Regions:
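Conserved beta-strand-loop-beta-strand hairpin that lines the nucleotide-binding pocket
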Residues: 1-23, 68-144
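Short hydrophobic/aromatic-rich motifs at helix boundaries and adjacent loops
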Residues: 11-14, 32-37, 47-48, 86-88
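STAS-typified acidic loop motif
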Residues: 22-38
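A short, structure-level motif marking secondary-structure boundaries and short turns
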Residues: 24-26, 48-50, 100
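Conserved short strand/loop->alpha-helix "switch" segment adjacent to the catalytic nucleotide/phosphoryl-transfer site
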Residues: 34-61, 107-109
Length: 144
């Protein structure tokens, strides 16, 4: 997978001064999660939040794995700082199930745990589809 920095994320309703959002586009060439994890770690570290990066690295691994397994095309990873919360979003060009639901986890195939982990790591999470695009996000308040 090759990671290409995009830029600051699109303007979002309710965005306040001091909020920040960065996006990286991943071009799928292999199932290598390292660029996504490094992007999350570097972004949060740049905002002085390196001590909180581990959980977001785990979450981005799960969300990108889902995008590789169930989506298509390029994958965008966005990390946003909004007030006292960090938001992580992963979008792909596929058509995920609507609504996205938990799958029964398996002990043999290793599948079905990703969204459960994201649920446990976040204060809130969700997913939505747009024409030709699926976006899954999680949000968590900063730990003080």
């Amino acid at each position: 997978m090759i990671g290409v920095p995009v830029t600051a994320g699109p303007e979002e309703p309710g965005r306040r001064p001091g909020d920040a959002s960065l996006t990286m586009r991943l071009v799928s060439e292999a199932a290598d999660l390292a660029p996504a994890r490094q992007f999350v770690r570097a972004t949060l570290g740049g905002w002085g939040l390196a001590d909180q990066a581990a959980d977001f690295e785990l979450a981005v691994s799960e969300l990108v794995t889902n995008a590789l397994s169930h989506g298509e095309g390029e994958i965008d990873v966005t990390v946003g700082l909004h007030g006292d919360s960090v938001r992580l979003a992963v979008g792909d060009e596929g058509f995920g199930p609507d609504p996205i639901q938990f799958r029964e986890p398996t002990t043999t195939g290793g599948g079905g745990w990703g969204l459960r982990l994201v649920d446990g790591l976040s204060d809130s999470w969700g997913a939505h589809r747009e024409p030709g695009r699926t976006l899954v996000w999680m949000e968590r308040r900063l730990q003080v």
